[in-house]
Amino acid sequence: MKPQEIDSIYNELREDFAIIGLTGALGSGCTTSAKILSNALDNNFFKTFSDHYLSDISNKSSLEEYRLKKIETFINNKTWKSFYHLKVSNLLYCIFFNHTSKIYCDDFQTLDWFKDHNNIIETQKLCTKIVSLIMESHGNKKTKDNRELSESLIELDNNIKINVIKNSNYTKDFQKIGELLRENGLKEFINFSNKTSTQPSNNVFAISEFVKNTIQHLRSEGHAFFVLDALRNLHEINYFKARYSNFYLFSVQADEPIRKQRLLNEFGYKEQDYEPIKKNETNKNKNHSQNINACLSNGDVFLSNNQNHEEYLKYQLIKYVCLMRKPGLFTPTKDERNMQIALTARYNSGCISRQVGACVVGKDGYILGIGWNDVPENSIPCVYRSSKSLILHNNSSPEFSAYETSDIFKNYIRNEIGSNDHPFCFKDLENKRVGKQEIATFKQVTGIEISSLDETVLIKKLKNPTRERALHAEENAFLQSAKVGGGSLKHSTLYTTASPCQLCAKKAMQLGISRIIYIDAYPDISNEQTLKSGNSDKWPKVEAFLGVAESA
């Protein structure tokens, strides 16, 4: 096939329609990224970036100046296409104000948002109009001259900027509104009896469906490239990934102290507001809640926004949008190549809780070991084990240990989860069994009663992580190198899809790992306690992964 024919195919696939979803914790820079993507590109950007900022990147990749030239040439030939900035929070705002009784409900502090309460009625009228446009007309064919929805959304955005105080109460309320919509659907806010749209069959996709209808309507008004600011629920992200082949998730990352400082200084949050908002962002126990860590780790492209200036963030966005529009425009960086190996390795994991991959690369750039979290050799992964097999096959099943086939554990399994074909997690069930036992002993000795709710919390606190059957991905990568005679790991780099726990961090320190690149941050003190111990000159560099991953 001729190069011109290939270009023609990509023009049709990548130039006519694309969606970028942004995800990241509050203060990481999702809105800043969306503004960059929605603005025109300064003609002098590439020269300015090359003169003042390129050297910082070139220290990490000797090919970056050549990538920059390729990107600049592509933009000169194809031109920069600005994205339509679609604020998901503004759409939630419309849905909320579409229902009069919700506005003055005690569950929300609506009156505290507004600088002038007289603006509420006008806001409600505008929001009702926007909801009607989206719900009634998204399937009808429009002409590009009719830009009623585009203009109404601009009017709404200006209305919010002028009249609304986006403080911590506003953020908390909108986290609550998002949860309500994902749990109960749109029916609490929108009357479907007189709409051409129907209520989504699964409530968790209620917001996704509304955004999809909005995009469909805006496409009929002539818009082609969209940036969604922002997605913070994994099911919503998976909805867009499944529906649109040209959907790309950009994970925007910034270190927590930087994010916190931005919220306190730039957004007027108070110190006591930060932890509750952070907790709501990382609720992994409910399908309808925000779960930033899961969203970030599912990114197609990972960006850093730790800098005080926007130029580096802007370069990253331009770079990956160009790659999105023309796959193969430039080759992967060393970090992208090696992290892709770690990402691929995780699919070998038979763990039913999470899948992690790791790759150790020597100082000369050669792979020394690959690993994934899984059980030791001669053991059967959890994904292939079930309580039915344990209970019914007596002691003849090779997938179970001598302890698991003992009466004490088998009887507990029979009473706790019964006989079924689903895999079970030994660590979780054994921790629960031992936890209940310890609480029963405590109550018997002290005579103190403990409620069932407190008991559940205590069991989680009493869990013992050493009961897990699997070795961690990092351990397996280290051991693979030792097993096959790969030589010293001193001054090597560890690529892992989840940052090391304390146990793996200690092993990395002992082996002399000099750099650790991760995607998903592990929620413990391993970085501060273990990796930043002793002579600071010998601390390994710990960095969040930047670049393209998975299918992007």
Where are these regions (language model features)?
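Extreme N-terminal, non-catalytic leader segments
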Residues: 1-26, 36-74
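Small-molecule kinase domains that catalyze NTP-dependent phosphoryl transfer to phosphate-bearing small molecules
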Residues: 6-7, 205, 237, 265-317
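Walker A/P-loop
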Residues: 31
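Zinc-dependent deaminase catalytic domain
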Residues: 104-122, 126, 132-214, 218-219, ...
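Short, acidic/turn-prone active-site loops that include or flank metal/cofactor-
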Residues: 48-58, 90, 252-258, 308, ...
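Conserved phosphate-donor/acceptor-positioning beta-strand/loop module used by diverse small-molecule
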Residues: 229-231, 240-267
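Short, surface-exposed basic-aromatic patches at helix termini and helix-loop junctions that form
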Residues: 78, 238-248, 506-517
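P-loop NTPase motor core
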Residues: 57-130
